[in-house]
Amino acid sequence: VTTQDFTHDIDTILCVGNGYWIFKGNKCLKTNMAGDKLLVDEIDITASGAWPALAGTRFARDLDSIAFSNESGYYWFLKGDSCIATNGDGNQIVCSERKIAGGGGWPALDR
């Protein structure tokens, strides 16, 4: 049962691996690279197979952006002026919530 309309007002999209994760509210889904097949149907952002480590954090919904680091294998979630990171499996917080600029996220932005 779908609860979000993924045809408009998307929060953010992340291209990683074999497809695109699309986020809206507290839900996400994954399509293949062509965008014509669902690889993961709509689930909670905090569901197993997504990012369960975000449960209980303010990053469990309404995200501004997400970045994947090829270097560390971490997923960085951004919301407002803060960020948090999970491991590649999404089941462990590897960098606790901090300010994006100057707080350990991207210190070079604090100018």
Protein language model features and the residues they cover:
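Disulfide-stabilized extracellular ectodomains of secreted/luminal proteins, especially beta-rich
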Residues: V1-R111
